[in-house]
Design a protein with these regions (language model features):
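Alpha-helical scaffolding within the catalytic cores
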Residues: 178-180, 190-194, 245-254
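Charged catalytic cores and adjacent phosphate/nucleic-acid-binding surfaces used
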Residues: 1-135, 145, 154-155, 200-213, ...
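Stable alpha-helical elements in mature extracytoplasmic
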Residues: 149-156, 221-228, 281, 285
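Non-catalytic positions within long, well-ordered alpha-helices that form the structural scaffold/packing
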Residues: 161-162, 233, 258
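N-terminal carbohydrate-binding/catalytic regions of secreted carbohydrate-active enzymes
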Residues: 144-146, 152-180
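Binuclear metal-dependent hydrolase catalytic cores centered on His/Asp/Glu-rich metal-binding motifs
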Residues: 203-238
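Active-site neighborhood of phospho(di)ester-bond hydrolases with catalytic His/Asp-centered motifs
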Residues: 134-141, 165-173, 192-195, 239-243, ...
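Short acidic, glycine/proline-enriched helix-loop-strand junctions
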Residues: 179-192, 285, 289, 294
C-alpha cells in the first residue's frame, strides 16, 4: 500500500500491462474473417521495441477516429491540467508555479500529437509468407488539395517501402497519375496509375487505365453519380467506393452501386473520419461484396500525415473477384467504430495496451522499472530520491541556513 500511495501511476501502469496481457489483441487481423492471419505478421524494428512506450503511444494517437480524438484530447488536456495544478498547489507554491505546472501535461500531450503527425520514426513492416503482392490501393501526394506540402512521389514511395509495401496506387484528388511523371530514382515500390474522383457525395477511386472524365455530369444526384462506374469500366479501369462517403451518404443505396457496375469497396481506411466505420456495417458490405463477387480492399489513404499505416493488402496472383485480395489490419483501427467517442479517454489506452506484443510489453515494464528505481533510490548521500533531482535543477529552491546551535551547546 505504501508503494501504491507513493507511486500510483507506476503501479497502476504495471497492473494494466499485466491485465491486458491476459487477452491481448493479435498483431494483425484479417478484416474479412476477423481472425489472425497465419501467414503474415509485423516485423518491429529494434528501436521501435526499445522505445515501445513512445512508439505505441504515437501509433495510438495516429489510429484515432475523428470524434474519439476530439473527446480524448479534450478530456486528457483537462485532466492533466487539473492534476498539475493540484500537485503544485499542494506544495504551497505561488500561482505562477501552479499555472506552469498545469500547462506541462497539456503541452506534452500536444507535442506527442504533433509528433504522431510529422515525426519520422521506426515503424512496423508487414512480413508475409504467402504468395502475392503487398499493395496499397489509395494514397496521395501533395498534388491533392489536402496533401502535406512537399509530400512528393519519392516520399510517398519511401513511406510505403518502410512498411513492407511492394506497390501502391497513386490516387490524388481529381488529378490523374498516369505514369507520365518519372518514378522516383531508386524506389523499390512500384507506383501504379490511379485517381480519386470527387462526385456527388461520394469519392470514387479509379485505378488501372485512368482517363479524364467530365465530373460535373456525375455530380447532381446519386442516379447520375453511379454512372461513373460504367464510365471507368469502359476506359479499362477499376472502380472502388471509398470510405467514409459510401457509409455516411449512401448506406441505403449500395445495391444501386453494384447494379451500376462498381468493382469493389474499401472496408478499412486509415483516415480519421473513416476509422469510425462500425464493424456491423463492415460485415454487411463484406457480405454484399461476396454475394456479387466484388473486391474488398484496405486503404492507407495517406496524405503525408502520420508515419504508420493501419492496413495492408496482399493481392493474390491469378485470383479474381472477392478472392483477389486479403486485407490485414491493425486491431486498434478496427475497434474504433464500435465505441462511442466519449469512451475514448479510457478505451484508447486500454486498446493500445491490449495490442502490445510480448517484446513491447517487456519494454514497457522495463521502462517503468527504470523510472521507478530512479525515483526510489537517492543519487547521492543526503539527497532525496528520484526525479526530484531533475526537478530541483529546474525549480531550484533557495537554500536555508541552519539555525545556530543553542548557547548551551557552545559551552
Amino acid at each position: 500500500m505504501n508503494l501504491l500511495r507513493r507511486h500510483p501511476v507506476a503501479v497502476t501502469l504495471v497492473v494494466l500491462l499485466l491485465l491486458t496481457a491476459i487477452h491481448p489483441f493479435p498483431a494483425l487481423v484479417d478484416a474479412v474473417t476477423g481472425s489472425a492471419p497465419g501467414d503474415a505478421d509485423l516485423d518491429r524494428p529494434v528501436l521501435y521495441v526499445l522505445f515501445a512506450p513512445i512508439s505505441d503511444t504515437l501509433d495510438a494517437l495516429t489510429f484515432f477516429s475523428q470524434s474519439r480524438a476530439i473527446w480524448a484530447l479534450t478530456i486528457w488536456v483537462l485532466v492533466l491540467a487539473a492534476w498539475g495544478a493540484v500537485r503544485a498547489s499542494s506544495d504551497s507554491f505561488g500561482w505562477r508555479r501552479v499555472v506552469l505546472s498545469a500547462l506541462v501535461g497539456p503541452v506534452v500531450l500536444v507535442l506527442l500529437a504533433l509528433a504522431a503527425l510529422v515525426l519520422p520514426r521506426p515503424v512496423p513492416r508487414l512480413v508475409s509468407d504467402g504468395p502475392g503482392t503487398v499493395i496499397d490501393y489509395h494514397a496521395h501526394t501533395n498534388a491533392s488539395h489536402d496533401g502535406r506540402p512537399g509530400w512528393t512521389l519519392a516520399k510517398l514511395a519511401a513511406w510505403h517501402e518502410r512498411q513492407g509495401f511492394q506497390a501502391t496506387y497513386v490516387t490524388d484528388h481529381n488529378v490523374l497519375y498516369d505514369r507520365s511523371m518519372p518514378a522516383p530514382e531508386g524506389a523499390s515500390v512500384t507506383l501504379l496509375p490511379g485517381v480519386e474522383w470527387s462526385v456527388y457525395r461520394q469519392h470514387v477511386v479509379a485505378i488501372g487505365r485512368v482517363e479524364a472524365v467530365p465530373r460535373d455530369s456525375f455530380s447532381e444526384s446519386t442516379a447520375r453519380m453511379v454512372r461513373m462506374f460504367s464510365t471507368i469500366e469502359r476506359q479499362g479501369g477499376f472502380s472502388i467506393a471509398s470510405l467514409p462517403e459510401y457509409w455516411r451518404n449512401h448506406q441505403e443505396e449500395l445495391g444501386a452501386f453494384v447494379v451500376a457496375g462498381l468493382d469493389g469497396f474499401e472496408i478499412v481506411n486509415c483516415a480519421p473520419k473513416a476509422l469510425a466505420f462500425p464493424s456491423d456495417l463492415r460485415r454487411q458490405v463484406i457480405s454484399l461484396a461476396e454475394s456479387h463477387d466484388l473486391v474488398v480492399v484496405g486503404a492507407s489513404d495517406n496524405h503525408g500525415w502520420g508515419a504508420v499505416t493501419c492496413v495492408w493488402n496482399v493481392s493474390r496472383p491469378g485470383a479474381q473477384g472477392f478472392h483477389t485480395n486479403r486485407v490485414f489490419s491493425r486491431p486498434l483501427a478496427l475497434v474504433q467504430g464500435d465505441w462511442q467517442g466519449w469512451t475514448a479517454p479510457v478505451t484508447q489506452p486500454w486498446f493500445m495496451l491490449r495490442s502490445l506484443s510480448w517484446s513491447e510489453r517487456a519494454s514497457w515494464l522495463t521502462w517503468v522499472l527504470i523510472i521507478l528505481l530512479y525515483r526510489v533510490f537517492p543519487r547521492r548521500e543526503g539527497q532525496t530520491a528520484g526525479i526530484g533531482i531533475l526537478a530541483r535543477s529546474i525549480w531550484r529552491r533557495p537554500r536555508t541556513t541552519p539555525p545556530p546551535p543553542p548557547q548551551s551547546a557552545r559551552l
